[in-house]
Amino acid sequence: MPNPKNLPTYYDEFVESAKKTKKSYALSTLNIFTYRYRLAESFDGMIAPEVGRTLTGYNVLTKVFLAYTAYESIVKVSRQLRVKNVNQFELNVIWNSELAIRLRKNEKLKTYLLSRKNDSGLDTKLKNFFDGSTSDIICVAYALRNVFAHGDLTASSVGTETIAKRKIFTALANTILDYCDDRFTDCLDKL
């Protein structure tokens, strides 16, 4: 649970630990993480009146994108600090069976992500996710991040047209941010 400034829960403790640590190599990445986290946690949407209802879909996808950038930073620094149970990006997982079930019900999302050409590792993870073999939700966020940042993703192509569907994407972003907040706390124990 973030603090009122939308920074990680133990941000104040981080500031104090940063003054004392001998592991200065990790401080830069932890700082980057805290501000990426704050942006993702604080993000409430863009203002573009002429775009119309499509903007609400882009807003939830942007929140997932921002949460994933925070995730990238925390995984990197967690690995540097040798935090337990954090693997390299292609092997790291975030399990959430309830959210996985909700994501799998979005047929547009499934069709869109499975039709994209990704690296073979991500393709395999997505197939396993959508066939119910795994509840690792981070592969969905990673695929969304890729097509959002580098591809031809539109908000309607992944099923963001209803409030209920948009709430699932918000839940995906929030689950990633919760994971990040927990790993940040683990990192503090290693400083």
Language-model segments: residues:
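Short, solvent-exposed loop/turn segments at secondary-structure junctions
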Residues: 76, 153-155
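Short, well-structured alpha-helical interface segments that form or flank functional binding sites
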Residues: 35, 58-69, 133-143, 167, ...
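Intrinsic-disorder-associated interaction segments
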Residues: 1-7, 26, 92, 96, ...
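Short acidic, glycine/Ser/Thr-rich loop/turn "cap" segments at secondary-structure junctions
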Residues: 51-55, 124-129, 156
